[in-house]
Amino acid sequence: MGVFHIVVGLGNPGQEYEKTRHNIGWRVVEELVKRQNLSFKIDKKAKSKVAFKEKLVFVLPLTYMNLSGQALSYLLQKEKCSSKDILVILDDISLPLGKLRFRPKGSSGGHKGLESIIEELHTEDIPRLRLGIGPLPEGEQLADYVLKPFLEEEKDKVEEMILKAIQFFECLQKEGIEIALNKLSA
């Protein structure tokens, strides 16, 4: 089995949010599921869309971003996992567009979805893959910016970042954390 048991893509449900900056984590998990010819089912108790592959669970919380922890709390109990068995994939305004950063634990960094997960699970020991969507343009409000779609001229970089995130996850599961981190920083 790979490094992680539960892979969560943070985002907001609904078509109006599909292509927004805030939903980049959601898009990565959707693509991971699609590439493995899996499909999502709704798990009402988990308040999520879930897809299973052997001992791996892909999760898209159907709560809005700020309540993402509710979905994970239930799934951790159901799957008998600890917070260290989760990989949360999320957007990060403090990273430049296209940059990826893995952290095994830490604060929410102001990200409301991650903050909800930390609060619900009562720990900061939650591995996460942060995907750069920044920087925040001068004069722009954060809430407005993250809920906007990417600009046309950013789309190639976004697709490249999604691909890098998928490659990182696949390497992580097959070859382990050390090799995946080396490839990520290369």
Curated annotation (Swiss-Prot):
Stretches of the chain forming a coiled coil according to its record: none
Location of this chain's protein in the cell: Cytoplasm
Native species: Methylacidiphilum infernorum (isolate V4)
Residue(s) at site: Discriminates between blocked and unblocked aminoacyl-tRNA: N12
Record SUPFAM superfamilies: Peptidyl-tRNA hydrolase-like (SSF53178)
Lineage, opening ranks: Bacteria, Pseudomonadati, Verrucomicrobiota, Methylacidiphilae, Methylacidiphilales
Keyword set, alphabetical order: Cytoplasm, Hydrolase, RNA-binding, tRNA-binding
Keyword Signal: no
UniProt family annotation: Belongs to the PTH family.
UniProt-annotated site: Stabilizes the basic form of H active site to accept a proton, residues: D91
Gene3D superfamilies, per the entry: Peptidyl-tRNA hydrolase
Protein name in UniProt: Peptidyl-tRNA hydrolase
GO cellular component: cytoplasm
Top-rank EC class of the record's enzyme: hydrolase
Catalytic residues (positions): H22 (proton acceptor)
Gene Ontology biological process terms, A to Z: protein quality control for misfolded or incompletely synthesized proteins; rescue of stalled ribosome
GO molecular function: peptidyl-tRNA hydrolase activity; tRNA binding
Binding site for tRNA: Y17, Y64, N66
UniProt keyword Transmembrane, yes or no: no
EC number(s) stated in the UniProt entry for this protein: 3.1.1.29
